[in-house]
């Protein structure tokens, strides 16, 4: 008996059938993967029920929801516009944030992205009068760009992803259809790292080198900042970022998105270069803000 007699005709399988087969295979593989490597709570490591669901156990999820129950405006330590966050960087929040950033728990992105989306919603509501100002919006009326904070090439290589980019995408997805504006995340393959020489001598875009990681990129050799003081962070960030495609943001309304706001040095530099490129920065949104004398 040949394959056609058994009811299988490879030449006649429709795209719809192939799609259903692929979906079934993906679900089957996901189920097998979960059987071999059961899911656990990202915060307390307790085993989670089989099947899809939050990346936190019921108790930790309740604590997370309490921590992010109400958005708030914070006073940044740098010259940045209005900043809206969903929580303070304490309690359960650091464990969730670091789980997503450093432990590969990208299954936490939906929870964090939802928190970020609520911040974006509040900021947009506060600036809703700007959407009717054609002189500001021009040809791109009723569209707001979510600009994720950049990750260094070394951190992207280590993690395999850029945290703020994942969160901005998730926030945009959750807000789709709920707002009078369409939100989109700027493509992430058009800006690289500014060379040290271009920072020192004001080099042109042609001097830019390094890995393409997002609309904005940190200067090469930037390294980690978390051990630096607020003043040191500000000095280190000045001139570190470049918008390499100014035409993509000129005359556009932008919101800067990040996972955690510490001193505001990164946000301040993003505001500077985006404004120089001609964009209108409405503000900064983040999942959490770090209290003074604390560091993520």
What are these regions (language model features)?
Residues 1-296:
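Glycine-rich phosphate/pyrophosphate-handling loop used in enzymes and phosphotransfer proteins
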């Amino acid at each position: 008996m040949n394959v056609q007699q058994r009811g299988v005709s490879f030449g006649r399988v429709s795209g719809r059938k192939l799609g259903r087969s692929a979906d079934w295979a993906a679900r089957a593989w996901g189920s097998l993967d979960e059987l071999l490597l059961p899911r656990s709570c990202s915060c307390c490591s307790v085993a989670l029920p089989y099947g899809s669901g939050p990346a936190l156990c019921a108790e930790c999820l309740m604590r997370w929801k309490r921590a992010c129950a109400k958005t708030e405006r914070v006073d940044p330590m740098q010259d940045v516009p209005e900043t809206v966050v969903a929580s303070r960087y304490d309690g359960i929040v650091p464990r969730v944030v670091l789980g997503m950033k450093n432990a590969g728990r990208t299954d936490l992105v939906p929870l964090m992205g939802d928190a970020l989306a609520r911040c974006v919603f509040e900021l947009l509501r506060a600036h809703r009068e700007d959407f009717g100002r054609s002189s500001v919006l021009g040809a791109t009326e009723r569209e707001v760009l979510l600009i994720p904070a950049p990750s260094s090439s070394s951190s992207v290589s280590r993690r395999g992803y850029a945290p703020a980019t994942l969160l901005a995408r998730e926030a945009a997805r959750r807000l789709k259809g709920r707002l009078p504006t369409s939100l989109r995340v700027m493509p992430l393959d058009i800006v690289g790292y500014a060379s040290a020489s271009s920072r020192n001598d004001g080099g042109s875009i042609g001097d830019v080198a390094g890995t393409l990681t997002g609309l904005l990129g940190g200067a090469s050799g930037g390294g980690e900042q978390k051990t630096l003081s607020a003043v040191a962070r500000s000095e280190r960030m000045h001139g570190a970022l470049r918008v390499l495609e100014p035409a993509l943001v000129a005359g556009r309304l932008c919101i800067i998105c990040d996972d955690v706001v510490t001193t505001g040095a990164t946000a301040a530099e993003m505001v500077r270069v985006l404004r120089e490129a001609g964009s209108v920065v409405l503000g900064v949104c983040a999942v959490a803000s770090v209290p003074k004398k604390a560091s993520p």
